Regions:
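Active-site rim helix/loop that mediates acceptor-substrate recognition in acyltransferases
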Residues: 11, 16-61, 153-178
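Conserved beta-strand in the GNAT
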Residues: 44, 50-60, 67-74, 105, ...
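Conserved acetyl-CoA pyrophosphate-binding loop and the N-cap/start of the following alpha-helix
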Residues: 79-91, 206-210
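Non-catalytic positions within long, well-ordered alpha-helices that form the structural scaffold/packing
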Residues: 97, 118, 211-215
Length: 251
């Protein structure tokens, strides 16, 4: 089993592996590979040229430090329970360290994964809050481009927040939308008559009015806060500074 950056001829295998691992639609997968994927931000394990597993990340920044947001690890069903996830995680840490990254972030989706990543050197560092609400009287808002969203987000981010721009926002915009109001900034995904506020910065009390303005009956929002455990962090050099807020989590 060899671990390396993927080649161009392996991309169709990576697409198939993603679908087998996560069950996403062809449209979603096409969006990721068109706007979020980069061979230099992927490590894949292959046996005789056949891709068995792959790890993907996005670049991020915190107080001048270069971070990697480890987004996904996909393993082919035929190669599961062979330690490939752990091998890819170890390889990624070594690779990122060699390329001058200061730290790595990831977001576990359950307590079991949180414990597993803890054994790999990751520790809890960030928190978030979430809430649901019904629609209220509409507030003024407007759609914004990813460039304007990036500029405004730097103004709204908490002082201990991670900057996520470039490919992060290009990919996010393939399935979500960006909005700005007088005192808030929102990245949101439409889901039938419900809205998922992936990140609401600024005035969280505007949430019911946001739903009213966009025509949704109810929604669920993630905001800065301390109610829930968030991202985990692994320093890749001595003295790397850990963030306290990591908001754009690609669920």
């Amino acid at each position: 089993m060899e671990i390396d950056y993927p080649t161009g001829v392996q991309e169709p295998q990576l697409r198939m592996l993603w679908q087998l691992s996560f069950g996403d639609s062809e449209e979603f997968i096409a969006g990721f590979f068109a706007s979020g994927y980069c061979p230099r931000r992927c490590r894949c394990a292959a046996e005789n040229g056949n891709v068995a597993a792959a790890l993907y990340w996005f670049d991020a920044e915190f107080r001048g430090q270069k971070f990697a947001y480890l987004y996904a690890v996909a393993t082919h069903p035929d190669f599961r329970n062979r330690g490939l996830c752990r091998a890819l995680m170890a390889d990624a840490a070594a690779c990122l360290t060699g390329r001058g990254y200061d730290g790595a972030l990831l977001m576990p989706h359950d307590s079991g994964l949180r414990k597993m990543y803890g054994r790999m050197g990751y520790r809890d560092c960030c928190t978030v809050s979430e809430f649901s609400c019904e629609a209220g009287e509409a507030v003024a808002l407007r759609p914004v481009s990813d460039a304007e969203f990036a500029r405004l987000r730097r103004e709204y981010l908490p002082p201990d927040g991670v900057i996520q721009e470039g490919a992060n926002l290009s990919y996010l915009k393939s399935y979500a939308a960006f909005y700005a109001g007088g005192d808030f900034l929102l990245a949101a995904e439409h889901d039938g008559d419900s809205l998922t506020g992936m990140e609401l910065l600024g005035n969280a009390a505007a949430a019911p009015g946001i739903l009213g303005a966009l025509g949704f009956s109810h929604g669920h929002f993630r905001t800065p806060g301390t109610a829930l455990p968030g991202a985990m962090f692994r320093p890749l050099r001595p003295g790397a500074d850990a963030p306290g807020y990591f908001g754009l989590i690609f669920d």
